[in-house]
Each structure stands twice: as structure tokens, then as C-alpha cells.
Curated annotation (Swiss-Prot):
Top-level taxon of origin: Bacteria
Pathway: Carbohydrate degradation; 2-deoxy-D-ribose 1-phosphate degradation; D-glyceraldehyde 3-phosphate and acetaldehyde from 2-deoxy-alpha-D-ribose 1-phosphate: step 1/2
Coiled coil segments of this chain: none
Keyword Cytoplasm: yes
Cofactor dependency: Mn(2+)
Cofactor: record remark: Binds 2 manganese ions.
HAMAP family: Phosphopentomut (MF_00740)
Stated family: Belongs to the phosphopentomutase family.
Protein's name in the database: Phosphopentomutase
Compartments where located: Cytoplasm
Binding, Mn(2+) 1: 10, 348-349
PANTHER family xref list: PHOSPHOPENTOMUTASE
GO annotation (BP), single: 2-deoxyribose 1-phosphate catabolic process
The gene coding this protein: deoB
């Protein structure tokens, strides 16, 4: 029975990529800088003291992969862990450092074109686009129209949005059009419909924007607003068949999306969708689906919280504590890896919580592979994330993806 379980620790970079300078990210190191902060005692408090504690990830080779990436073993991690998995690090060949680019490249389809971006910090969106959306959605107007942190803008405009019914439009350094609306006063279905209209207008206008993101929130006043787990991403479809689509088309296989995976691939090559919010809930759903998974199945989970709750918010301690939670629960996944199964732990980009600004960082990603038939040891430097996709299609006996070399 052939099954692959892929866990993406969203934004978990392990050192600046060779081309990081082009992105202003020379020296970024998500894991290394978190480990440094913990070793300096910045995470010490009642019930938690000392360096970053990731024993299970270290046994899978995380520390050694990071050392291969940066030339330096992350401070405080276990140098003497017995290695039970294959480990390496991968560079990205896609033009951006965003979520779709990273995930598509993992699946064998790098983004070699340039996404469109809304670069103006204020009045970010073209007036014609805004007018068309307002008219089609019958809106009283809009708020925002700027670059913003998704949590800060709620405190700034959330109350006005609730009073006026005007949605909050904003963007970032990524190729995104984001819409924040109150779940109760505006309504979730209405927000999703608005996002569909925005996606259609962006497509018609040839803006080449990667994602429209629904950002529902609750609360009644500044300081009290919080985003809910009902986020929804409307992505464009990958430009070529991914490993997911190939498994479904060529072997009538199954691909189970947990978290935001289905949104990232625009539902192409996905046969089952499971929603879950938060690291524990994502783990629970993954365990359940791994138990149910039959032959020719990929169980594919995105752990978004590392990125959205800690990376972008530059919360070093929160990020490290989330990694420790992930590590504590990892053995529950590992014990479900049977016979021919392969478990792959990786990331889609970096988001160094010690870095300036609030955006992603251009970094190498870890590639940690575990299974009864996987030979422990170094996989070295992988020249593209697509080596993961090529390895997966080879394992399932599918036609090759266009990019990447199989790792074994």
C-alpha cells in the first residue's frame, strides 16, 4: 500500500537562500534566530526554561539540515540526536517567496513568471477595479485600499466597517487582494460572494494576482477583534499538472487536503477537504485522515499558524513554542507511518520573526523524510522544492513532473 503524508510547516525556513539579497533577506534564518532567542533565555517563564526543545524533529535530521544550509548548527538543539530519517535542504527557483509559489513548486510546478502586485502603500488598488467590485456587489463603498497588517487594520477600521457595512480592502508585499468583514454584521456567505466577484474582476482585468483572501473576523471594539478560522483563499490554478493532479488522473488516487491546501491549489487534484484551525486541531485531523487513508493516497496538511500567528507578527517566542508543540505531537504521526509509507516534513518559504517588516523571507526549506523503507542520512542540497514532487510521482509510478530530480 502506497501512501505519502506531507506536512508543510508554513514559513519554517532554515537559512537565507542563495538569492536572498535580491529580496532584501540576506541573513534571514527563521529556525536559527528562534533557537538563538531561546538560548538567550528570551522564552524563559514559569513552566518553560532553556533552549528550543525539538527532540523529534532533531531525530529526523532538522538540526543537520539547518547546519548544511547555513554552516552553523542551531544553538541549543541536540547535536547528538540519533538520526532516523533522511534530511536535506532545498532552494526555491520560483520568482516569489509566497505561499502559492512555494506549494506549487513542492508539487513540481514552480512559478517562473512574475505575479502582479499592488505596490502603492496607499490607494493601492486601481479605481476601475474598485468601482467594478462595488457596482457588482452592490456595496455602500469600501474601507482601507492600502497595505496593512491584517490584525492592525481591524483595530483601525473594524468599528467603522460594522457601522457602515463597507468591506475592508487591503494588500501586502504578496500578490494578494484581501477582504476583511465581520462574520456577524456583514455575514460569511456575503463575504465569500464578494471574494468571488473580486476574483472574477481581477481575472478579467488581467492583473495576474495570485490570491483573493476572505478574512472574516469577530468582536465588537478595537483590541477585541480577532480573525476566525473561516478564512478562504481563491487562487488561480497551477499552470501545469501537479503531483496531486497526476495521482488523481493517472491512478484514480486520493488527495486529502487538511487546512488551506485545497485553496492553494484552487481545488485542482484534491479529492477530499478537511477544515481545521490551530496546530492541535490540524494534528487531530491529520491523524484521523492518516488512519483512514487507503492505497494511492496523499494526506497533505498545511500548518498555517507558524506563518500567520507568529512569523508575520514577528512573535519569536510564540513561534518557538508552536514548534515545541508540533514536536511534542510528532510521534503521534510517526507511529502511523506503516510499511511503504513516506512522511515528508517541509516548508513553503521563510518568515523570520526577528526580521524587519512583516513579510516572508527568502530562505531554504527543510526536507525531512521518514518511513520504514527510507534510508537515514543526508539528502544534501536540493536545487528546487520540486525535488519533493518528483520524488512523490516516482514513488507512486506516475509520469514525471516538469521540474526536479527524485531524491531517492
Amino acid at each position: 500500500m502506497k501512501r505519502v503524508h506531507i506536512m508543510v510547516l508554513d514559513s519554517f525556513g532554515i537559512g537565507a537562500a542563495g538569492d536572498a539579497e535580491k529580496f532584501g533577506d540576506q541573513g534571514a534564518d527563521t529556525l536559527g534566530h528562534i533557537a538563538q532567542a531561546f538560548a538567550e533565555g528570551k522564552a524563559d517563564k514559569d513552566g518553560r526554561k532553556g533552549p528550543l526543545h525539538l527532540p523529534n524533529l532533531c531525530r529526523l535530521g532538522l538540526g543537520k539540515a539547518a547546519e548544511e544550509s547555513t554552516g552553523k548548527f542551531p544553538v541549543g538543539l541536540d547535536k547528538d540526536a540519533e538520526i532516523i530519517g533522511a534530511y536535506g535542504y532545498a532552494s526555491e527557483i520560483s520568482s516569489g517567496k509566497d505561499t502559492p509559489s512555494g506549494h506549487w513548486e513542492i508539487a513540481g510546478v514552480p512559478v517562473l513568471f512574475d505575479w502582479g502586485y499592488f505596490k502603492d502603500l496607499k490607494n493601492s488598488f486601481p479605481q476601475e477595479l474598485l468601482d467594478n467590485i462595488v457596482k457588482r456587489a452592490n456595496l455602500p463603498g469600501y474601507l482601507g485600499n492600502c497595505h496593512a497588517s491584517g490584525t492592525v487594520i481591524l483595530d483601525e477600521l473594524g468599528e467603522e466597517h460594522m457601522k457602515t457595512g463597507k468591506p475592508i480592502f487591503y494588500t501586502s508585499a504578496d500578490s494578494v487582494f484581501q477582504i476583511a468583514c465581520h462574520e456577524e454584521t456583514f455575514g460569511l456567505d456575503k463575504l465569500y460572494e464578494l471574494c468571488e466577484i473580486a476574483r472574477d474582476e481581477l481575472n478579467k482585468g488581467d492583473y495576474n494576482i495570485g490570491r483573493v483572501i476572505a478574512r472574516p473576523f469577530i468582536g465588537d471594539k478595537p483590541g477585541n477583534f480577532s480573525r476566525t478560522g473561516n478564512r478562504h483563499d481563491l487562487a488561480v490554478e497551477p499552470p501545469a499538472p501537479t503531483m496531486l493532479k497526476k495521482l488523481v488522473d493517472e491512478k484514480q488516487g486520493h488527495v486529502v487536503s487538511i487546512g488551506k491546501i485545497a485553496d492553494i491549489y484552487a481545488n485542482v487534484g484534491i479529492t477530499k477537504k478537511v477544515k481545521a484551525t490551530g496546530i492541535d486541531a490540524l494534528f487531530d485531523a491529520t491523524i484521523e485522515e492518516m488512519k483512514l487513508a487507503g492505497d494511492n493516497t496523499i494526506v497533505f496538511t498545511n500548518f498555517v499558524d507558524f506563518d500567520s500567528s507568529y512569523g508575520h507578527r514577528r512573535d519569536v517566542v510564540g513561534y518557538g513554542e508552536a514548534l515545541e508543540l508540533f514536536d511534542r505531537r510528532l510521534p503521534e504521526l510517526m507511529e502511523l507511518v506503516k510499511e511503504d509509507d513516506i512522511l515528508i516534513l517541509t516548508a513553503d518559504h521563510g518568515c523570520d520573526p526577528t526580521w524587519q517588516g512583516s513579510d516572508h523571507t527568502r530562505e531554504h526549506i527543510p526536507v525531512l523524510v521518514y518511513g520504514p523503507k527510507v534510508k537515514p542520512g543526508s539528502l544534501g542540497h536540493r536545487e528546487t522544492f520540486a525535488d519533493i514532487g518528483q520524488t512523490v510521482v516516482k514513488y507512486f509510478g506516475l509520469s514525471p513532473v516538469e521540474y526536479g530530480k527524485a531524491m531517492f
